[in-house]
Amino acid sequence: MHSSLLWLGAVVALLAVNNVTAVSTEANGQVALSTSKGQLAGERAEEENSIVRSLRAVETSEDEEERDLLGLFAKSKLKKMMKSESFKLKRFGEWDDFTVGYIREKLKNKYPDLLLNYLNVYKKAGNEIVRHANNPNKVTFSNKVRARIYKTNS
């Protein structure tokens, strides 16, 4: 009982701060809040959501590069992958969500060894290499590798 009174008090305070003058429930179950300016808060929120959606739809390659600064293909993470085998194997697991073409494009010929390692070791070994990601010295392969992908001089 005491916690529901606190909750109700918090709701009333929130409504007062936002100048809400009336609260009504519509037939579809949504709650509409009328403000002193006469505009429904629900309509305003819907309008703001559509603006955000339209901004999100106009993304450029610059936006994508900014995300990559903190993402899977950030230069700092790629350098760390070159130094740490266990970190590299964890990141390879996250690369499975992308196509090989996309990964190759993101690496931009700066990290060809990572791509070759991803294709020749991680993809060929499957779950066996993931099982030993914390101790890469214990990795064993049960299947023979049937094909290798090599970098060319072109």
From Swiss-Prot:
Where in this protein would one find the motif RxLR-dEER, according to its record?
A: 53-67
Summarize subunit and interaction data from the UniProt record for this chain: Interacts with the potato PP1c family proteins PP1c-1, PP1c-2 and PP1c-3.
Which family is it part of? Belongs to the RxLR effector family.
Gene name as annotated: PexRD24
Alphabetical keyword list: Host nucleus, Secreted, Signal, Virulence
Q: Which organism is it from?
A: Phytophthora infestans (strain T30-4)
Q: Where does the motif PP1c-binding motif lie?
A: 138
Summarize the record's induction comment: Expression is up-regulated during the biotrophic phase of infection on potato plants.
Comment block on domains: The RxLR-dEER motif acts to carry the protein into the host cell cytoplasm through binding to cell surface phosphatidylinositol-3-phosphate.
Q: Where in the cell is it found?
A: Secreted; Host nucleus, Host nucleoplasm; Host nucleus, Host nucleolus
Signal peptide span per the entry? 1-22
Its recorded name reads RxLR effector protein PexRD24
Job description of the protein = Effector that interacts with isoforms of host protein phosphatase type 1c (PP1c), mimicking a regulatory subunit and causing their re-localization within the host nucleus. The holoenzymes formed with PP1c isoforms act to promote late blight by attenuating jasmonic acid (JA)- and salicylic acid (SA)-mediated transcriptional responses of the host plant.
Q: Which GO cellular component does the record give, naming just one?
A: host cell nucleoplasm
